[in-house]
Amino acid sequence: MPLELPPLPYDYAALEPTIDAETMRLHHDKHHQAYIDNGNKALEGTEWADRPVEAVLANIDLLPEDRRAAARNNVGGHANHAMFWEIMSADGGGEPSGALADAIADTFGSIDDLKTQVNEAGVKRFGSGWTWLIHDGTGLAVVSTPNQDSPLMTGDTPLLGIDVWEHAYYLNYQNRRPDYLAAWWNVVSWEAVGARFEAVR
């Protein structure tokens, strides 16, 4: 099946004031759509065209060399953004609960310590990329990736990811990436992140 743009699970303005409606419109309708269009071109005519996105990214080094970079950037971009929309909510913020909260406390000390590590990784990411909370098969970890690289490419499971490409925040925050990262936690859906954790723990 070709890659397809998933609908936003909320209105463009639902995440204001943290993320403004125009940023959401451009980010979803233009940027994400471009990753899909270019990802489909990269996979077209290969044995990977009908494979699940997760399988493509987990085996990115097996793709034809002349398609690999485009697939890495664009299929990765699609996977990253599809998750990004799902883990945000107009009713977001607060703190996690249950097994996820326990795992965060065991690994990082507290939710505030986790936020600090995720934010620091995002601030330190030079240029464009993502900052992540992942499950690496044994437990939780914070990592960052360049461009549209996905933790799926290294066998890890993304639980939470924050886009630190400028297109994700520049209209509202200009060059103030730390402010964007600090504000983003107001829209995180811990319910969605917790469901992702339950699926892999």
PLM regions and their residue ranges:
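Feature for soluble, non-membrane regions of globular proteins
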Residues: 1-201
